[in-house]
Each structure stands twice: as structure tokens, then as C-alpha cells.
Amino acid sequence: MACTNNAMRALFLLVLFCIVHGEKEESKGIDAKASGPGGSFDITKLGASGNGKTDSTKAVQEAWASACGGTGKQTILIPKGDFLVGQLNFTGPCKGDVTIQVDGNLLATTDLSQYKDHGNWIEILRVDNLVITGKGNLDGQGPAVWSKNSCTKKYDCKILPNSLVMDFVNNGEVSGVTLLNSKFFHMNMYRCKDMLIKDVTVTAPGDSPNTDGIHMGDSSGITITNTVIGVGDDCISIGPGTSKVNITGVTCGPGHGISIGSLGRYKDEKDVTDINVKDCTLKKTMFGVRIKAYEDAASVLTVSKIHYENIKMEDSANPIFIDMKYCPNKLCTANGASKVTVKDVTFKNITGTSSTPEAVSLLCTAKVPCTGVTMDDVNVEYSGTNNKTMAICTNAKGSTKGCLKELACF
């Protein structure tokens, strides 16, 4: 009987061990494969190394596959450390809502051969309710390849990889993170709706080529707030087909300012309307607030309902600039008048200093003049001593109130 009891006790302990061990193994499986509502995926538990040298692409992609395949709220954790990754494709639709928590640094590979089909670095496609947040960096490591950029010499140049590209993403948020030294654009949104970009930092040297901060096209309901951008091209650029954009509390500089355009380069571009830029500061930028359309425009489109208010210029060149004969690097294919119509544009309470005598330049065309331009309390003065503050206004129609007398175009 004692032997039997001992045998039964041993059998019971063996079964208990197997159950516990099985639960542990099952728990490990849940970490790697989403099942049930909610989940968290730490890339280091999937094989990623934070030493800045080991390729962690596979681990990050595995984390995405698991999170996107799970229901409920799913989180991908990028912990502290430096994680070298190649091209990442985060494709939806997802079963649940995915948050990418960036506490560490993602480093883009500098090996351009790893970006297939002229691809981007991090490309997110057809994902709703996506959140990218944290205090970490998305480092494009652009200095290693900027010398390969030929876009200042060729009209149809081969572009380098953009850092963060979101296509067909709705109800998304990017907050807190820093986008650093992109090879080309830092952030690009295409056909996105209802996106919030807040408390983001975007930084690259002022002479880095085509490193636009945030670009958008064919998108609507975009809000950018409390964001600091200093880059080598436009801090923010609003492309064709975009509407209902609110930009507030943005500090820009260095860079080429906050721009609508360029417009008209390609056929079948759509209108731009309902753009509001408010409570922003531009520091030593090449342009301030700007609308630009190609002089050899291939599209007929309209820019309307544009409102700039409470904008402070700190020694920025060309603070207010509408350019309907835009031709970067003099590489346009033909001369001609832009087919882009600009109307109903308001500049209200624009103050500060300009590093160029031309504080206001409205360069519109005789064939398609700019109309409904309102200049209300525009008081920007030239900071130099070798000339006077002035405005150049060509083929523009509108009204002026409370402006520096030298800037009263109408």
C-alpha cells in the first residue's frame, strides 16, 4: 500500500509537472502568435538585438504579423536599444488595433540594395486605427547616401527611400517620436484620412537634399500640432488632392517653410482646399508660408480656402510667397504659364522679420491671376540694412488692412 501510494504520488507529480510545463510552452507560443483579444510583442523576445549592428528586420516583421493578426488592442514594443533594420512592410487590414511603442531607436540600413522596387524604409499600407508613439527615434541614416541624390541635377531623378510612408491609413496617430536624417522624405501620407501628428520632432541638416519633414497628398482630415521640424527642404508640404488640414503650434527651421505644392507636375492632379495654418513660428527658413505651382503645369486644378494666421517669422527669407512659375533648379521641361488657379487666400497677423527685402511676393500669371487674396495685419520687416522692406505683387487681386505700408499690395 505504501508502495502504491508512493507510486500514485510520483505519477501525480509527473502529471502536474507536465501540465505546468505545457502551460509555460503555451505561454511562449502566445508571445509569438496572437490568439485572443489583446497582445504585446517585444521584438527582443523574437530575436532582435539592440546592438546597432545585428539585422533585426525578421523580428520586427514577425512582431507585425502577430500583432496585425490578433484581435483587440495589440502592441509592438521597440525597447531601449539600437535596432538595425532593413525595409519593413506593415500591411493590413489588421484584425485589431495596433500600437507601435517606440522606446528605442530603429536604424535604417544604409545598403540601398535592400530596398526592393525603389521601396521605402517603413511602409504601412491599409491599416486603420494605427498608433506610433514613444520617445525613441526612427533614424534613416541619410548621411551615408545623400551623395547619391541626383534630384538637383535631373528632372526625373531616382528618389532615395522615404523613412515613414503611410498609404490608405485612416484614424491614425503618430506622437512623441523623433524622425531623424531620412534618406529622402521623413514622413509621407498618401490617401490617408483623419490622421493626428502631435509632439513629433523631425530633424536633418539644413543642407540635406530633399529631406522634407511631413508630406501629404490626396489626403483629408490631417492635423499636425506641437511639432518641431528642421530639415533640408519643406518642413511641411501639402500635395495635390488634399483637403481639411489643420497645422497648429509648429516650429519650422531650418528648411523651406510650410508649403502647398509643388502642384501641377503630373496629369490629373486634384484640387487643394480648406488648409489652415495657425500659431506657427518659422526660424531662418528659405521660405515662410508658400504656394508653388509648376510653370509648365500638366494639370488644371484649383487651390482655395487657404488661411494663415498668427505666424511669426524670425529672420526667414521670402516670408509670404505665392509662386505660379515654380521651377526647381531650373530643370523644368518647358516654359509656360501655370494652369493652377489660386483663390481665397488669407494672411492674418503675420509678424516678425525677413532676411530678404521682399517680405511679400505674389507672383501670379496674367492668364490665371490670383484672386480673393486678403492681407490683414501683415507686418514683417526686412532685418538687413542695405535695402528696404518691399512687396512684389504681380497679377494678384485682393484687399489689404492694417499692413505695413510697404506691403500693401492692394
UniProtKB/Swiss-Prot annotation:
EC number, UniProt record: 3.2.1.67
SMART domains membership: PbH1
InterPro entries: Glyco_hydro_28, PbH1, Pectin_lyas_fold, Pectin_lyase_fold/virulence
PbH1-type repeats, residues: 192-218, 219-240, 242-262, 272-293, 337-377
Localization terms from the record: Secreted; Secreted, Cell wall
Active site: D233, H256
GO BP terms, alphabetized: carbohydrate metabolic process; cell wall organization
Chain positions carrying an annotated carbohydrate: N89, N246, N349, N387
Keyword field contains Cell inner membrane: no
Catalyzed reactions per annotation: [(1->4)-alpha-D-galacturonosyl](n) + H2O = alpha-D-galacturonate + [(1->4)-alpha-D-galacturonosyl](n-1)
Cysteine disulfide links: C235-C252, C364-C370, C393-C409
Tissue: Pollen.
Keywords for this protein: Cell wall, Cell wall biogenesis/degradation, Disulfide bond, Glycoprotein, Glycosidase, Hydrolase, Repeat, Secreted, Signal
Broad class of the protein's primary localization: secreted
Signal sequence interval, chain numbering: 1-22
Recorded GO MF terms: galacturan 1,4-alpha-galacturonidase activity; polygalacturonase activity
A GO CC annotation given for this chain: extracellular region
General function of this protein: May function in depolymerizing pectin during pollen development, germination, and tube growth. Acts as an exo-polygalacturonase.
Family: Belongs to the glycosyl hydrolase 28 family.
Protein name (record): Exopolygalacturonase
Organism ancestry: Eukaryota, Viridiplantae, Streptophyta, Embryophyta, Tracheophyta
Gene name as annotated: PG1
